[in-house]
Amino acid sequence: MEALPNKENQCVVNTDTFVSMTDEISSVMESIPASYSKTICEHMKRLGCTIEDLSFESGLTIRTINRHRSSETLKPSLASVVALCIGLKLHPIFSFDLIAKAGHRMSSSREDTAYSMVLMTMVNMDIVEINKYLIAVGVKTL
């Protein structure tokens, strides 16, 4: 995102950047599968992410990731879905899509609010730092 200073020395975001991002995100959203497990596989493929990379970035075991990737009947915990989103460094739009496909709906609870904060503002942070934040706000770690 390109921010340009205006004459009052305030940063103004270039609208063209948002148009481009909207086009890109919309294109991906139209092409990803309807199922939870297939959506994970598609994001991994699209991002060039291996299972080993995802395990390292998310803190989830390879076995757990494989279950998420292969089971259409899995009822994953919200924490594990959020961990996958963090591991894949998904844009919040993709994260909330994956959460919905996993059968979850974010509420106004403290836990869901903390997870939403993570997905919207901390997605590029290390999982260890994210877990420190979650501990600080009294929420289950990823």
Describe each PLM feature range:
Residues 52, 63, 93:
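Key DNA-contact positions within bacterial/archaeal DNA-binding proteins
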Residues 59-76, 101:
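Recognition helix of helix-turn-helix/homeodomain-like DNA-binding domains
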Residues 17-53, 127-142:
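A short, Lys/Arg-rich alpha-helix, primarily the initiator
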Residues 86-88, 112-142:
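Long, compositionally biased
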Residues 1-13, 96-125:
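Short, charged recognition helix plus adjacent turn
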Residues 72-86:
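Short, basic-rich loop-to-helix N-cap that marks the start of a DNA-contacting helix
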Residues 45, 56, 86:
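Alpha-helical residues within the helix-turn-helix
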